Regions:
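Short beta-strand/turn micro-motifs at beta-sheet edges
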Residues: 6-10, 89-96
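A generic structural motif
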Residues: 26-27, 110-115
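A common structural junction motif
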Residues: 49-54, 124-134
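Hydrophobic beta-strand positions in extracellular immunoglobulin-like domains
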Residues: 22, 108-109
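A conserved active-site cap/scaffold subdomain adjacent to cofactor or substrate pockets
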Residues: 41-44, 97-99, 107
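Fold-level recognition of mixed alpha/beta catalytic cores in primary-metabolism enzymes, strongest
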Residues: 1-53, 70-72, 170
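Short amphipathic alpha-helices in soluble, non-transmembrane regions
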Residues: 36, 45, 117-129
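An extended, acidic, His-containing surface patch that forms the Zn2+-binding/catalytic region
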Residues: 38, 57-88, 138-177
């Protein structure tokens, strides 16, 4: 384990990176009622994430001996977000349009006690609710990267071998994390 040479990492949380794109209908900025603003749709989704999903994730803890302690819970990080037109560096402000697209990249770390399909489904459920609230909104979810969580039992032969050699070389017992 790179944190300390006397530590044996027994596992890691799973990873699900995904791009969520909310789509609406483009319109002129002076008449936003003729469009469907994807940024507002994403804001609705993010409000559901903050008020409903984040508190649930904070309650989920793994039996794995993770360091630091915060790594023992399921987490969701919002890596990046972009909506509307890009601002033109040399030409001033972007065109006055109702954004028809807003993209978010999320990073969900999940526990060995969780199920891959349930992890994805809880995000989809919030997106479905966002979509149902505003006519003309839709969404796409594109998986970017994913890894299953792993956990090796502390009494596994490989762990016992590492424990033995750490103690022999460093003259101190190994710590399991």
């Amino acid at each position: 384990e790179p944190l300390d040479v006397d530590r044996v990492c027994l596992g890691h949380r799973g990873v699900w990176w995904a791009e969520v794109e909310v789509t609406g209908r483009i319109g002129h900025g002076s008449m936003p009622f003729l469009g469907v603003n994807a940024i507002r749709g994403m804001a609705d989704f993010l409000a559901l994430v903050e008020t409903e999903l984040m508190p649930r994730l904070a309650e989920r803890r793994t039996r794995m001996p993770c360091v630091p302690d915060g790594a023992r819970q399921a987490t969701l990080n919002l890596n990046s977000i972009h909506g509307g037109l890009a601002e033109a560096v040399d030409e001033g402000l972007p065109a006055p349009v109702v954004a028809d697209s807003c993209r978010l990249v999320l990073d969900r770390r999940w526990l060995v006690e969780e199920d891959r399909e349930a992890v994805r489904a809880e995000v989809i459920e919030l997106l479905d609710r966002m979509k149902a609230r505003t006519a003309g909104l839709d969404y796409r979810v594109r998986d970017l990267m994913g890894f299953e969580p792993t956990m090796t039992e502390a009494d596994a032969p490989l762990v016992a071998t590492l424990d033995h050699w750490i103690h022999r070389v460093l003259d101190r017992p190994a710590t399991h994390i």
